[in-house]
Amino acid sequence: MVKACAVRGALCAGLFFLAPAVLRAQDVIGIPVGETPPPVTLENLNGDSVPLSRWIGKKPVIVEFWATWCPICAELLPRMEAAQRKFGDRAEFLVVAVAVNQSKNTVRRHLERHPMPFTFLWDGNGAAVRAFQAPSTSYIAVLDSTGKVVYTGVGEDQNIDAALERAAGTPRAAKNPR
């Protein structure tokens, strides 16, 4: 009995001391903050090759990994549109349509029915997914004007404005910029 209590106590203490490390590990989503993604060439929806370097390294860039079937991506849309109205003159908004359970034609048809004010790019071979280490759709990476990642996040609860303010060099108190 005493031995079992000692083992349980040791396990609880170990878990207590490991918990912060586990939580920090969970904060790393996709490409680490401070890194620069490798060069990537995608396609526009007309099939033309487009290097991301056309935008990256010139001014802040927000990249969202998106799919027509992603409900969280749809929930992020109003925030993305509001951020574009606020930062559109100081940042580029790129949406990378991933080739998971959708085709380029599906994306094109979706955008004809539901126009969005962003630059859409097609990641048919997963090059951008690999470069940004995107774990899922609704993943967002924000890069500053030097091309370094200043924020990554996934899901509907992202503070896009704070991330863009950090990228643009106008930080303010933010709930969850990473």
Question: Which role does the model predict for each range below?
Answer:
Residues 9-20:
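Bacterial N-terminal signal peptides
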Residues 1-11:
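Bacterial N-terminal signal peptides that target proteins for export
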Residues 59-61, 66-69, 136:
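Short pre-active-site segment immediately N-terminal to redox-active cysteine/selenocysteine motifs
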Residues 170-178:
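Non-globular targeting/processing and membrane-anchoring segments
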Residues 74-114, 124-131:
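Structural microenvironment flanking redox-active thiols in thiol-disulfide oxidoreductases
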Residues 112-117, 124-166:
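Thiol/disulfide oxidoreductase modules built on the thioredoxin-like
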Residues 22-39, 57:
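N-proximal helix/coil linker or "cap" segments that precede and/or mark the start of modular domains
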Residues 40-60:
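A short beta-strand-turn-helix
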